[in-house]
UniProtKB/Swiss-Prot annotation:
Protein family membership: Belongs to the tRNA pseudouridine synthase TruA family.
Active site: residue positions: D52
Enzyme class: isomerase
Function: Formation of pseudouridine at positions 38, 39 and 40 in the anticodon stem and loop of transfer RNAs.
GO molecular function: RNA binding; tRNA pseudouridine(38-40) synthase activity
InterPro entries: PsdUridine_synth_cat_dom_sf, PsdUridine_synth_TruA, PsdUridine_synth_TruA_a/b_dom, PsdUridine_synth_TruA_C, TruA/RsuA/RluB/E/F_N
Organism: Pelobacter propionicus (strain DSM 2379 / NBRC 103807 / OttBd1)
Source superkingdom: Bacteria
Subunit structure: Homodimer.
Entry protein name: tRNA pseudouridine synthase A
Gene: truA
Binding residue positions for substrate: Y110
Length: 244
């Protein structure tokens, strides 16, 4: 048996997230059906994470085992023939039999994009959060400095998050602005459900002047989801890279 590692890009707009589920079409389901058509056998993908409905990925990593002896390029060009335009396999590689995409990941890089302008942009609506009022990016960056380190992120998760522990390590949070776009890059060891989106929503509330930058430090010491910011829309979030 071979273990094949795939790097996948997708626009999550029309999907109910990565993971196969009873209600709604998932990215994983579409990929597994394409591989079934290519290989003539059903495979089960194991991924480096589970993006939520509407969240995008530039480099989701997933693996599967197969007895087929196809060349690696066939897993790219061949499978892509059976995939819709909003999902593509970028590369395929042989992996060790014990490779585990989520457990072996050293860090993940997420990017949250904000379109900060008075008037909405139809061309950016699927890949950014439109915030009308001007944001103070200097205040947002001051707030972001509190995130790196190992902290209790209970205030920055979904109410239905079932993680056994809310301790997570964040390596860096940076904010860059270019014209009307504000980009929040978050790199960390692992994330709770909706964690990056709540972080982004809280930083936007700092930028709006609703919170002082020190609110982030307070929330990490006093984890209360109700005292954090809104959950930013899924459309602005993208998984950029997974490091091993």
């Amino acid at each position: 048996m071979r273990t094949i590692k795939l790097t996948i890009e997708y626009d999550g707009t029309n999907y109910a997230g990565w993971q196969v589920q009873p209600n709604g079409l998932a990215v994983q389901q579409v990929l597994e059906e394409a591989l079934l058509r290519l290989l003539g056998e059903r495979v089960r993908l194991r991924s480096s994470g589970r993006t939520d409905a509407g969240v995008h990925a530039r480099a989701m990593v997933a693996s599967f085992t197969t007895s087929r002896s196809l060349p690696l390029q066939a897993f790219v060009g061949g499978a892509n023939r059976f995939l819709p335009d909003d999902i593509a396999i970028l590369s395929a590689a042989e992996a060790a039999p014990e490779f585990r995409p989520i457990q072996d990941a050293r860090s993940k890089w997420y990017r949250y994009t904000i379109y900060n302008a008075p008037v909405r942009s139809p061309l950016r609506r699927l890949f950014s959060w439109h915030v009308r009022e001007p944001l103070d990016t200097d205040a947002m960056q001051l707030a972001a400095h509190h995130f790196p380190g190992r902290h209790d992120f209970a205030a920055f998760r979904a109410s239905n998050c079932a993680a056994k522990t809310t301790l997570r390590r964040i390596d860096s949070v940076t904010i860059a602005s270019e014209g009307e776009l504000i980009v929040i890059d978050v790199i960390g060891e692992g994330f709770l459900k909706n964690m990056v989106r709540v972080m982004a929503g809280t930083l936007v509330d700092v930028g709006r002047g609703r919170f002082e930058p020190e609110r982030v430090a307070w929330l990490l010491e006093n984890p209360d989801r109700k005292k954090a910011g809104v959950t930013a829309p899924a459309c602005g979030l993208c998984l950029m890279d997974v490091s091993y």
